[in-house]
Design a protein with these regions (language model features):
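Catalytic-site neighborhood detector that most strongly recognizes the C-terminal catalytic loop/helix
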Residues: 226, 322-347
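Flexible interdomain linker/hinge and immediately adjacent N-terminus
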Residues: 127-180, 225, 266-271
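C-terminal secondary-structure termini that scaffold catalytic or DNA-interacting sites
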Residues: 348-384
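N-terminal core-binding DNA-recognition domain of tyrosine recombinases/integrases
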Residues: 19-33, 43-150
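Conserved tyrosine-mediated DNA breakage-rejoining catalytic core shared by Y-recombinases
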Residues: 200, 205, 209-243
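Short, basic (Lys/Arg/His-rich) helix/loop patches that form interaction surfaces
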Residues: 280-320
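Active-site/catalytic core of tyrosine-dependent DNA strand-transfer enzymes
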Residues: 178, 238-292, 384
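Basic, Lys/Arg- and aromatic-enriched nucleic-acid-binding interface segment
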Residues: 165-167, 171-204
Length: 384
């Protein structure tokens, strides 16, 4: 029976407790990708239990604590390590490389999956009588209990063993960097794909699953199947994207342009519909040329940031295009990028220094050394 993902035990046989949970999880309307994500997290948990010689239905809070400690101290498997030797931040994109250890979000997600797994068996009376994963509580009991939907959630202290997640600004690609990236693309297919990504703000998997029947050049819209709800939604895209798409479609064999077929195909025979991994490979090749570490999701963030910077586009319009359920999720794109903040403050400081010089004054030196000595050493006024 579906959901097509299983967790195998040391004997190569599916783990019954996980199998029944994943089936129940899938029947509740979850996507196959969500089932895969939960299965991988449960596999990580069961591997820890097997190493510790612990039964899954006899674990305690202490076992969960030891599991979190192991994730904080354990390096990822070599196949998962993508960080090259060198600095922690890419010089081209300004983005950090993937860490060699598990991120706080990964640990928290793993705890959420384990908690849901034991909640299921608690209701089914097939597991321990108490969920071993600590729950976040408020003064009134369960977090979010009696919450007024018109008010924002008030986040109290984290549940035990939950990791502190740093607040990060929304990622986006600066205009100059995007021009360099677009120039490095080698085919009309890749240019059309990226142009749709950066103008429609569609999720990578949503655009990869696009069919040519859902491309409406007349209305400048495409229809995508939303990742979460599964609903089909029309979203706008730029005229440049449709122009590149037409050039790409005209170069395809006639049998691949019949209505209802995939909008994207592999470049070599035998032709196959483009999948998510192949789309990621397009960006990986560009990253090798540019020395960057951009991802497909960066295009979605870039589109959102561009719309947020346009005063003619309301935040509710951005929310609708992005497919966000909560407006608070969209508000993250109202914050400026770090490079924009630095540029703006530098302009302010330069303007202030110029105003002081124009008034006949002398800007205060940030150094305790003589201004003449600093000028001789560094030249000009760049050190100021």
């Amino acid at each position: 029976m579906a959901p097509y993902w299983e967790v195998l035990g040391c004997d190569g046989v599916p783990v019954p407790s996980v199998e029944s949970y994943l089936q129940d999880f899938w029947v509740r309307g979850m996507s196959s990708s969500s089932v895969e994500s939960y299965a991988r997290d449960l596999l990580r948990w069961f591997r820890f239990l097997w190493r510790s010689d612990r039964d899954w239905d006899r674990v305690t809070r202490d076992d969960v604590r030891d599991f979190v400690m192991s994730l904080r101290e354990t390096f990822k498997r070599p196949a998962e390590i993508r960080r090259p030797a060198g600095p922690a931040v890419n010089e081209v994109s300004g983005k950090p490389y993937l860490s060699d250890v598990y991120a706080p979000r990964t640990i928290n997600h793993n705890l959420s999956v384990i908690s849901a797994f034991y909640d299921y068996h608690l209701r089914a009376l097939t597991g321990p009588l108490r969920n071993p994963v600590p729950e976040r509580l408020t003064q009134g009991g369960r977090f979010g209990a009696h919450h007024n939907p018109e008010d924002e959630y008030r986040h109290g202290r984290r549940a035990d063993y939950r990791q502190k997640v740093p607040i990060q600004a929304a990622r986006s690609i600066p205009d100059k960097a995007f021009e360099d990236l677009f120039t490095a693309l080698g085919t009309d297919r890749d240019r059309a794909l990226v142009a749709f990504y950066v103008s429609s703000a569609a999720r990578p998997s949503e655009l990869v699953g696009l069919t040519n029947r859902r491309v409406d050049a007349g209305q400048q819209c495409i229809s995508v199947t939303r990742k979460g709800s599964g609903a089909v939604q029309r979203i706008p895209a730029s005229p440049e994207a449709f122009s590149w798409f037409r050039l790409y479609q005209e170069a395809l064999p006639e049998e691949l342009t019949r209505s209802g077929l995939s909008a994207w195909w592999t470049l070599r025979r035998p032709y196959r519909p483009l999948n998510y991994e192949a789309a990621r490979a397009v960006i990986r090749r560009v990253n090798v040329v540019l020395g960057a570490n951009w991802t497909l999701h960066d295009f979605r963030h870039t589109a959102a940031m561009r719309m947020a910077q346009d005063p003619k586009v309301s935040i509710t319009d951005i929310q609708a295009v992005l497919g966000h359920v909560h407006l608070s999720t969209t508000e993250a794109y109202l914050k400026p990028r770090n490079d924009e903040v630095i540029e703006s403050v530098n302009r302010h400081l330069s303007s202030r220094a110029s105003d002081i010089l124009a008034a006949g004054g002398v800007p205060a030196s940030p150094s305790r050394y003589s201004a003449e000595d600093m000028t001789d050493l560094f030249g000009g006024t760049r050190w100021q």
